[in-house]
Amino acid sequence: MNPNQKILCTSATAITIGAIAALIGIANLGLNIGLHLKPGCNCSHSQPETTNTSQTIINNYYNETNITNIQMEERKSRNFNNLTKGLCTINSWHIYGKDNAVRIGESSDVLVTREPYVSCDPDECRFYALSQGTTIRGKHSNGTIHDRSQYRALISWPLSSPPTVYNSRVECIGWSSTSCNDGKSRMSICISGPNNNASAVVWYNRRPVAEINTWARNILRTQESECVCHNGVCPVVFTDGPATGPADTRIYYFKEGKILKWESLTGTAKHIEECSCYGERTGITCTCRDNWQGSNRPVIQIDPVAMTHTSQYICSPVLTDSPRPNDPNIGKCNDPYPGNNNNGVKGFSYLDGANTWLGRTISTASRSGYEMLKVPNALTDDRSKPIQGQTIVLNADWSGYSGSFMDYWAEGDCYRACFYVELIRGRPKEDKVWWTSNSIVSMCSSTEFLGQWNWPDGAKIEYFL
């Protein structure tokens, strides 16, 4: 083929390709015009696709707004919880929650906490604790053995998950706390400040409502577990004064975070700290810590309707504080049983006549092991003894604070008793690490006679070195 023929051939090919492209373009144009001008369309809209998209977004906005309004109406329609039921029969305890926080914290960003508890809303139950404003692996964890600092806050997080920066919700700022839901919303109280000038801020529905100033200028403090409400009235026990001598305890009565009244401690209890409370049959029972003299636990019984109370000690000779002497043959109902040497640990009990259970560390000298003992009529019988028991944590494993809680919104004709145990790790007992933190195990009652198992923290301290 000579050069002229090559040029002609190339030109013909180009013309053919161009013609095909033009035909495709014309076909596309015709198709689009046909689609846009189909019968029944509103031809005044020059950009119907854009208009349809906008309408969809507007409709979604309306739907989301309606859902939000429905949720708000549901909250408004909720009523105050009333303590109308009694306790369910307790024959044993089943596992309810465990967060394995220290084990997971060996390789993840888990927050340093202590003084944990569990508390329920109508929709869910959550873990609570006082964080230290740092993670277990963080350098600021050095020194977290100290109870009171500007970096502590009451946080909550999903049941059985470890507390992290990502899943925790700050309820209020402070180094001592309590929190409870009245059926309509949650009240949280945090105490902060220096030892001689601390104050409490009362939050309701996530807003600050009231404040309480120190009255004895000696470490104003409160329950370190949930409070309980009846018909909107939520009593809370506060103490201000020496941990090893006469202190000034008051019971405050709140409604929607506002103070209705307060009264000084009455009855025969001599020293009150860190009360663990539960409610049933319109009454509230709080089992507390006598850090001054008693190895037996003081009890405050509160009438939230009359807004009055009385106090005594658990009569049973089964002593439940730690440290403590060996159990005597006869207990004391109105006086502390000596032997705890100006020390103690937060604890709890369910005092329900023949259905009574007491919790305590297995060790009489330290915070290790944990057991539940069925002691009928322990509140009133100074010779009552255990007839049944269940080990929760073996004595070879560390324990700590413990407290009561209940899901008052669960279905059924009785309240299921529940409790948690703090599993402390790190200092002071394990001083190869610089931090002090904990995990949580929680149990609830069963009418069945279930088997028992050991529920330790499970972290190996050598993995942190």
What are the roles of these predicted feature ranges?
Residues E124-A129, S185-M187, A198-A200, V233-V236, ...:
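Entry beta-strands of beta-propeller and related beta-repeat scaffolds
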Residues N42-L83, I90:
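Long, low-complexity intrinsically disordered regions enriched in small/polar
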Residues P39-C41, G86, V118, D123, ...:
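Extracellular secreted precursors and ectodomains with disulfide-bonded cysteine-rich loops/domains
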